[in-house]
Amino acid sequence: MAQRSNRFLTGLIAAVAAVLMAASGAMAAVVIGNGSSNVLTGTPQRDVILGRAGDDTINALAGADLVRAGRGADSVNAGQGPDRVRGGDGDDALNGDRGPDFMRGGLGADAINGERGRDFISGGKGDDTLSGGVRRDVIFANRGRDHSDGGDGNDVLWALSRFDVDFIGDPNGDELTGAAGNDRFRVRDGEVDLVHCGEGIDHVRADQFDQVDNDCEHVDRRDITSLDQVEDGDENRVEPGS
């Protein structure tokens, strides 16, 4: 049964690689790990890389790669191309690069970092830590109790589930949207941020000029006249509608 499953998996990956080669016109390598902890490295072309049972290190290079972590605690480093990266069953670390990457967590408590590209980042089923990079990123907190940090760009942060989510803005003006959980928003960054809380009992720490929806139950505002005051000074508590 195991051999038949392995043959099916290998055939499936080869079929995906054939689709990628047909779409790109470039040769794609198929790199598959085994039950050990492997170092799996792609090529400058469009690759398919699949981790297996070990704690793998996966290095995608310059192509538009398709990467899937396996059952171990894997570390994935996307390359300079526009990569699609998916976490596996373990607590994985997924890191983007210069390309506009699509990265999604798996079953574990994953750490996903967008780095230098314009990235689409989505949490998985675990309690994930989601971080954008220096560009404008879109971040979705998914099924776990996630921690979302926009990074340096003008980012869009969303919650998609009933779980509680921590949102952190950055000094570039972000849009943050909660869902059904009891979410916490921290946007004291000296820029104009947009906060949409959604359902649940939500808490917002905002600057005086941030635009905070009336469905946010608890809002703490502070007048900011310089960035030096973002973490210092007295707080003012403002209820919705005031």
Regions found by a protein language model. Give the residues of each.
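Charge-rich, low-hydrophobicity low-complexity segments
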Residues: 2-4, 21, 27
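Glycine-centered beta-turn/loop sites at beta-strand termini
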Residues: 33, 42, 51, 60, ...
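Bacterial N-terminal signal peptides that target proteins for export
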Residues: 2-13
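Beta-strand repeat architectures
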Residues: 63, 149-150, 174-183, 196-203, ...
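Leucine-rich solenoid repeat scaffolds
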Residues: 187-230
